[in-house]
């Protein structure tokens, strides 16, 4: 992985201080300027060489964390190396061809022979002179705002590529092996009986180049039933960039978008929308319009502006929208040059099937079905395809074929309208039942999704499915075929006539925020489902309703649920919960140490069974330790009432999360549990543990920062260990990920040359982020010249090996790093364009005063050479 280094602290401090002395403007002009030495104080002020600050920004060679803007549009926060250029007083930004891709600027047609270069860096390669290669281009750097502005003609800017990373920048990562684990031990006892169990789950794998080998398993042991082990999900995987797809060989699951998902052992090849530009990965309509003059086009959604551009006279197309949400129509306003305005509305609602016009999504699977409850596992071929036809229609289709006489085909449409988004599809199945006949049937499905903007009511899903009497889905068909071929003794033989299968199914979900005159009164939800079945005539249903709100003293929620089973029995329940921060009870506005909140839950089933639970939880200042205590009382209609008390604690160690709980009940029963989860990565630098577990599909980063033990990665729980490595799993494939180190918890006296890096990993990769550090004792030196004059501000300080270890600040005070117990330093600067240097000796004292981990060395005398 190519690391993008960040802040050069000493350089930035030097520049900021010097700007204050010179009363610099926020933005530096590119024109030559001459500074008046009378602004500087000191005997030797007139001899200080200020020429390096006469040409634009006073940038010196180094690595700076900058905000990159292209044509005044923010692109990325990234580290840029500034290199020294012959004939230039100030360093210039080293912009490479790779940077142009990152900034979504088309690469100029150049080669090594005719490239116009600022410089050539051994690590970065060619530093391009954009002002020569791209006509009318300019590059400006604002030191105070740490902003790098690149202006190029609009024709050079890639279209529809906001937040997109070119495939040439996707990283395979390093070769590595990894293992994630979750272990849990449980012990319970009641008078006269003990029960114990152990559970362990593992996700492991290995990365070799672009290939990922993965497997998972779990182990169970119980006092009564003994032990068993299950090893599954064994596969190799890689992406295929040219197809924007993923390839899996081995055990995987078919997609559940078109048909019900099943486990297979074979091959799966499917398109991956994460590889597409964000403007193509999600649904949004293409806007067509006509401008009479040079016009400004503004698009709003829900009252918020989401897009604005300027178009020339004539027809225009806007195909790079990134709406803020679904369900609210788009309002398009065309403002002509004379001030006249025209407005029209573009319907915008979406269901999961909707795609942008011209965008396709596909999935192909083939292999042996893996189903635990059948004896004969057939081979399956399944394929599906979705395609955005226009702003209003997305078509999709799919097929399933097995080698035991089952086929199914599907056709469907997704529709975007002003009254919401609809989808409709029909599936036709054909199955041959052994010793019976061939059955054909259909299943019809309709769904609706709508946001009612006036009331903010979200009807997330209202779906209805009807299946004819002879329709069978794949899972039902395989189960029935297997039960007919392998009947169980003493049971009625299975057939299509007595096999229970779904007939109707309805699901509804409504969410309603309650707001009035900009005041929030909480939110309300309602959801329900109902289904019935062929053959058995049974039906099931479930309904729930709830309300939640937050107030100045805390939050609360109430919900109720009712369900009916196949026999018509009802099961009712009601829940009421309160959460009150302890600082509210104490009347303070700051977080208190110890416990942070009190939570209360009350529930009842209206059958004489009621429960009250009260708990309090908290966490340590560094969030590594969390804990809670709880107590409760249960009223049982059919048995004796029960009370309990318990506690829980967890610790985020460098090797994983350790947790334990204990509880005791009034019936003399006891429960104790211990658990841990985490993971580790084996790489060329050794074995590095992570205190976060990760799944087989997670993308990881191994971070190296020698000597930076204790630094948090991405401000989370993962830290750098004593060997200078750490692991984090919070990465998104095919997107720019900023890997940052929080240096507030550093345990050693070490300086990071950079505190963040940028990585663009492929799916499942392990990228390597190398943070350069400077280890060794740091010191604050108070230095004077042997001739009594002041050492010039910003003079460089060198150790005995010729390495720059610091710079002189105001009043001869300097911060240096990497000094020995005793030794010599040399200081160099320019006076009247002539080099001047002095030599000084230092020696550490055990009694020396310290600021943090830096010692203070006074009375350092520098002898003029």
From Swiss-Prot:
Gene from which the chain derives: htrE
Chief localization: membrane
Superkingdom of source: Bacteria
Gene null: resulting phenotype: Deletion of the operon under classical laboratory conditions does not result in any major effect on E.coli capacity to form biofilms compared with the wild-type strain.
Molecular function in Gene Ontology: fimbrial usher porin activity
UniProt topology in membrane: Multi-pass membrane protein
Position of the signal peptide: 1-29
Induction comment: Repressed by H-NS. Induced by heat shock.
Family: Belongs to the fimbrial export usher family.
Protein name per UniProt: Outer membrane usher protein HtrE
InterPro entries xrefs: Fimb_usher, Fimbrial_membr_usher_CS, FimD_plug_dom, PapC-like_C, PapC-like_C_sf, PapC_N, PapC_N_sf
UniProt subcellular location: Cell outer membrane
Transmembrane segments: none
One example of a Gene Ontology biological process annotation: pilus assembly
Cysteines engaged in disulfide bonds, as pairs: 838-862
Keyword Transmembrane on entry: yes
Other notes: The operon is cryptic under classical laboratory conditions, but is functional when constitutively expressed.
Keywords: Cell outer membrane, Disulfide bond, Fimbrium biogenesis, Membrane, Signal, Stress response, Transmembrane, Transmembrane beta strand, Transport
GO cellular component: cell outer membrane
Function: Part of the yadCKLM-htrE-yadVN fimbrial operon. Could contribute to adhesion to various surfaces in specific environmental niches. Probably involved in the export and assembly of fimbrial subunits across the outer membrane.
């Amino acid at each position: 992985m190519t690391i993008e280094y960040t802040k050069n602290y000493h350089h930035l401090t030097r520049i900021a201080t010097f700007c204050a002395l010179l009363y610099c403007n926020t933005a530096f002009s590119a024109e030559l300027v001459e500074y008046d030495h009378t602004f500087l104080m000191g005997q030797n002020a007139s001899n200080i060489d200020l020429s390096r600050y006469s040409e634009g920004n006073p940038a010196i060679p180094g690595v700076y964390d900058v905000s990159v803007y292209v044509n005044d549009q923010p692109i990325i926060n990234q580290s840029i190396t500034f290199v020294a250029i012959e004939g230039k007083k100030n360093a210039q930004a080293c912009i490479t061809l790779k940077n142009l891709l990152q900034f979504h600027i088309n690469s100029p047609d150049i080669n090594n022979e005719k490239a116009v270069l600022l410089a050539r860096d051994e690590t970065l390669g060619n530093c391009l002179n954009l002002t020569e290669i791209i006509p009318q281009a300019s590059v400006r750097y604002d030191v105070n705002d740490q902003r790098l502005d690149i202006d190029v003609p609009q024709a050079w800017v890639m279209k529809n590529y906001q937040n997109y990373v070119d495939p040439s920048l996707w990283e395979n990562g390093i070769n590595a092996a990894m293992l994630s684990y979750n272990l849990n031990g449980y012990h319970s006892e009641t008078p006269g009986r003990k029960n114990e169990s152990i559970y362990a789950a593992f996700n492991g794998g290995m990365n070799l180049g672009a290939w990922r080998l993965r497997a998972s398993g779990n182990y169970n042991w119980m006092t009564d039933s003994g032990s068993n082990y299950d090893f599954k999900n064994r596969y190799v995987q890689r992406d295929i960039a040219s197809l924007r797809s993923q390839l899996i060989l081995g055990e995987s699951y078919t997609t559940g978008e078109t048909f019900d998902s099943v486990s297979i052992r074979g091959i799966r090849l499917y398109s991956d929308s994460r590889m597409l530009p964000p403007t193509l990965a999600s649904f949004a309509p293409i806007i067509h319009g006509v401008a009479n003059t040079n016009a400004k086009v503004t698009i709003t959604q829900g009252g918020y502006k989401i897009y604005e551009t300027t178009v020339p006279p004539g027809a225009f197309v806007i195909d790079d929208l990134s709406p803020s949400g679904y369900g609210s129509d788009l309002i398009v306003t065309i403002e002509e040059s004379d001030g006249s305005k025209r407005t029209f509305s573009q319907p915008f609602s979406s269901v999961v099937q909707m795609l942008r016009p011209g965008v396709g999504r596909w999935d192909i699977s083939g292999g042996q079905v893996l189903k635990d409850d059948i004896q004969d596992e057939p081979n399956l071929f399944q394929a599906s395809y979705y395609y955005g036809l226009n702003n209003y229609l997305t078509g999709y289709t799919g097929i399933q074929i097995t080698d035991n006489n089952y086929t199914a085909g599907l056709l469907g449409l997704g529709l975007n309208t002003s009254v919401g988004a609809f989808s409709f599809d029909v599936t036709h199945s054909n199955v041959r039942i052994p010793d019976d006949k061939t059955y054909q049937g259909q299943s019809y499905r309709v769904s609706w999704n709508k946001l009612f903007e006036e009331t903010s009511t979200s009807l997330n899903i209202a779906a209805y499915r009807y299946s004819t009497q002879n329709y069978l889905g794949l899972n039902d068909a395989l189960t029935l075929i297997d039960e007919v071929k392998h009947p169980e003794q003493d049971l009625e033989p299975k057939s299509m006539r007595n096999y229970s299968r779904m007939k109707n199914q309805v699901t509804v979900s409504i969410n309603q925020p309650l707001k009035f005159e900009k005041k929030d009164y909480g939110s309300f939800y309602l959801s329900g489902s109902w289904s019935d079945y062929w053959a058995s005539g049974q039906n099931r249903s479930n309904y729930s309703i709830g309300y939640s709100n937050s107030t100045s003293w805390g939050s609360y929620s109430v919900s109720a649920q009712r369900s009916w089973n196949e026999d018509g029995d009802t099961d009712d329940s009601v829940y009421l919960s309160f959460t009150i921060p302890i600082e509210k009870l104490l009347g303070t506005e700051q977080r208190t140490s110890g416990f942070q909140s009190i939570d209360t839950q009350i529930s009842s089933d209206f059958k004489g069974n009621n429960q009250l639970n009260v708990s309090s939880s908290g966490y340590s200042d560094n969030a590594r330790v969390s804990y809670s205590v709880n107590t409760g009382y249960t009223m049982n209609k059919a048995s004796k009432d029960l009370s309990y008390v318990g506690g829980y604690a967890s610790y985020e160690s460098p090797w994983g999360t350790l947790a334990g709980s204990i509880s005791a009940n009034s019936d003399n029963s006891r429960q104790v549990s211990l658990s841990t989860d985490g993971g580790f990565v084996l790489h060329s630098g050794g074995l590095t543990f992570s205190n976060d577990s990760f799944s087989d599909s997670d993308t990881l980063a191994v971070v190296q920062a020698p000597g930076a033990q204790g630094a948090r990665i991405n401000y989370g729980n993962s830290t750098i260990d004593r060997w200078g490595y750490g692991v984090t799993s919070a990465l998104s494939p095919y997107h720019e990920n900023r890997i940052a180190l929080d240096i507030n918890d550093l345990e050693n006296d070490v300086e990071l040359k950079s505190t963040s890096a940028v990585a663009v990993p492929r799916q499942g990769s392990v990228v390597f982020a190398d943070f350069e550090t400077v280890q060794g004792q740091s010191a604050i030196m108070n230095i004077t010249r042997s001739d009594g004059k002041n050492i010039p501000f910003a003079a460089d300080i060198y150790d005995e090996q010729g390495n720059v270890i610091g710079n002189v600040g105001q009043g001869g005070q300097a911060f240096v790093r990497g000094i020995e117990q005793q030794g010599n330093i040399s200081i160099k600067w320019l006076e009247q364009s002539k080099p001047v240097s002095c030599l000084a000796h230092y020696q550490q004292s055990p009694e020396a005063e310290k600021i943090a981990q830096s010692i203070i060395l006074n009375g350092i005398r520098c002898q003029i050479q």
